[in-house]
Amino acid sequence: MFTLSVYQQKANKFLVSIYGDREASAIIKLWFGSRLDMSPIDLIIRREEEVTFPTFEADLAQLKASTPVQLVLGEAFFFDRAFVVNEHTLIPRPETEELVAGILERFSNDELKVIDVGTGSGCIAISLQLARPNWSITGVDIHQQTIDAAKANAAKFGANVDFRLTDVLEEALPEFDLLVSNPPYIPVSEAQAMDRNVVEYEPDRALFVPNEDALLFYRRLLELATAEKKDSPLYVAFEIHEDFGEEMIELCASFGFKEVNLLQDLQRKDRMIFAQYGD
């Protein structure tokens, strides 16, 4: 048994050389906090306490191999909730929290039918349902293992979300008032410049699109959204690639959407589209 500071020093020694000081520090804080059930303050004030850390060596070996810390732990935080994640789900990002926050700012607790396309871990659908209990929310994805993870998260948090296996490029969607999606949007040519822990460990199908048709999923979703005339307006909320903001505005307008709003994330990068169709 060693003191917490000894474990911290050993972890830091190996991880700084791989990830750099800042990212190594963030990884250690998340890793130790989860495994030892300690808050960030505990990790400081209890440094000289002896602790039992049976998974330390196995965890460190995975981290040295560039496995994302969230996959080592099997969980990722989103809206302060620890969602189950695995090799079949995209790891939730802070930018997606901003998308959810933007939706909650724009829509009240009035009854809405909402669909989350490419639901992954279910973090968007579940976070929306817990914040807006009156909404009827469906989450769809193309792989059963992904749907299983989303269902596990819904059960964990007591969220009433209907998760369905659906290939959105081939199948229709249930009726909805609001369509939300963080679909694949990274051109495959960008993979070579991305971090190894993303490219090698997160599902390609959740990340990449063909170089020649980077807006593939958005076009299909807008087709589905406008396929049938509704008596009431419908809305879309998308997370997008930072380089395609203007193209997305034009695409939405070409399908008859109005009030198309492009928003930036906290890094001041074009990241979200909110648009309305019909009156």
Label each region the model flagged.
Residues 1-73:
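N-terminal auxiliary segments of SAM/dcSAM-dependent transferases
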Residues 8, 28, 56, 66-69, ...:
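A general structural signal for well-ordered alpha-helical segments in protein cores
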Residues 21-22, 109-110, 230-233:
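Short helix-terminating capping/connector loops at secondary-structure junctions
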Residues 39-40, 65-69, 74, 79-81, ...:
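Glycine-rich, flexible loop/turn motifs
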Residues 52, 92-95, 217:
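An acidic site on a long C-lobe helix of protein kinase domains
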Residues 57-133, 137, 143-152, 274:
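SAM-dependent Rossmann-like transferase core, predominantly class I methyltransferases
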Residues 135-136, 140-279:
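S-adenosylmethionine
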